[in-house]
C-alpha cells in the first residue's frame, strides 16, 4: 500500500482480511526532503528518521495498526535506513533539509562514490546507490535507526521491510549491524525482511537469512526465510532495467502470484496504483488453498 493515505488504507483493511492476507505493507512514513505529492521515488528520499510525511502521521499509523489488529492483520512499514534524500543536481550530497543531526558529522556518511560493480560485495556495502549513503555502522547512526524502529513498534507496527538491505554488510564481512539492530529492538517476534535483489551468492543470501527474511523474486536455499513476489514497486514503476514487469498485465502478475502462494511460505503482492486486481476472487482462492503456515502480505 505504497503512497496510500490513512483513509485509503483503513478502508482497504476489511477487504484485505477477506482476501486472506495476513499483513499490510505500508510505504515509507519518514519525513521527505520535499513537501507535496511527488513522483513515487520521492518516498525513498527521506530527511532522516523522523516519522510523518504527507501520506501518514504518527496518529494515522497508530490508528491503522489498531484497526488492522482488530481484523487480525499485522501492519508492516517500508523503512529507508541506509540513505537520505539528495541535493538537486548533486545525487551524492545530502539535501539541505536532511536532519541536522546527520549533517553535522562527516563520519555519519559513506564515501561520495557510487557502486561500480554490483558483483563485488565490498563495493556494494561501502559505496552509494546514486543517493547519499549513511554509514549505518557508526554507533550514533545505528542508535537513531533503533530509536526510529522502536518508535514505530510503540505505535503498533509488527514488521519492517528494509529497503536496499543488500548494501548493508554482514558479520562475515566484518559488520555486526544486523545482529546489533535485532538485539536493540524492544519486541521479539517482529517480521523483518530485507530487499536483497539480484544477489547470486547463496552464501550471502544464507547469511542474510540468519537475521532477516530475504525479499526477492526467486527462492534462496532457505525457503522458509524468503519473501517472494511476482512484482514489486521497483519492477513496475522504474523506467530503467529494474522495471521488468511494467509491460505485464495485472492478470499475468496475479497468476504468477497465485502460483507463488501455492508453493512458498511467505509472499508479497504489490498493489499497482489505482488497480483493483488484489480484490480478485482468484487471489482469495489461492490463499484459502495455501499452506496454513504461509504469510501473505499486501
What are these model-predicted stretches?
Residues 13-16, 30, 41, 63-77, ...:
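Active-site-proximal helices and loops of the catalytic beta/alpha 8
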Amino acid at each position: 500500500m505504497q503512497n496510500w493515505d490513512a483513509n485509503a488504507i483503513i478502508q482497504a483493511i476489511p477487504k484485505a482480511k477477506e482476501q486472506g492476507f495476513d499483513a499490510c505493507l505500508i510505504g515509507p512514513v519518514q519525513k521527505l526532503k520535499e513537501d507535496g505529492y511527488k513522483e513515487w521515488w520521492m518516498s525513498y528520499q527521506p530527511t532522516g528518521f523522523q516519522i510523518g510525511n504527507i501520506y501518514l502521521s504518527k496518529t494515522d499509523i497508530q490508528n491503522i495498526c489498531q484497526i488492522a489488529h482488530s481484523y487480525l492483520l499485522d501492519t508492516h512499514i517500508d523503512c529507508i535506513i541506509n540513505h537520505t534524500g539528495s541535493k538537486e543536481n548533486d545525487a551524492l550530497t545530502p539535501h539541505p533539509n536532511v536532519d541536522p543531526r546527520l549533517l553535522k558529522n562527516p563520519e555519519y556518511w559513506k564515501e561520495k562514490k557510487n557502486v561500480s560493480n554490483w558483483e563485488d560485495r565490498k563495493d556494494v556495502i561501502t559505496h552509494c546507490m546514486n543517493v547519499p549513503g549513511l554509514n549505518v555502522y557508526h554507533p550514533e547512526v545505528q542508535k537513531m535507526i533503533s530509536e526510529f524502529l522502536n518508535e514505530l513498534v510503540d505505535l503498533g507496527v509488527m514488521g519492517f521491510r528494509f529497503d536496499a538491505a543488500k548494501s548493508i554488510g554482514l558479520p562475515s564481512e566484518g559488520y555486526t549491524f544486523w545482529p546489533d539492530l535485532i538485539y536493540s529492538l524492544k519486541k521479539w517476534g517482529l517480521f523483518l525482511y530485507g530487499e536483497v535483489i539480484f544477489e547470486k551468492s547463496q552464501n550471502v543470501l544464507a547469511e542474510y537469512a540468519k537475521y532477516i527474511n530475504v525479499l526477492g523474486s526467486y527462492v534462496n536455499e532457505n525457503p522458509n526465510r524468503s519473501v517472494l513476489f511476482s512484482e514489486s514497486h521497483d519492477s513496475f514503476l522504474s523506467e530503467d532495467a529494474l522495471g521488468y514487469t511494467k509491460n505485464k498485465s495485472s492478470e499475468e502478475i496475479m497468476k504468477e502470484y497465485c502460483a507463488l502462494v501455492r508453493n512458498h511460505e511467505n509472499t508479497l503482492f504489490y498493489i499497482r496504483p489505482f488497480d483493483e486486481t488484489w480484490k480478485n476472487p482468484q487471489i482469495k482462492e489461492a490463499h484459502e488453498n495455501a499452506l496454513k503456515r504461509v504469510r501473505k502480505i499486501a
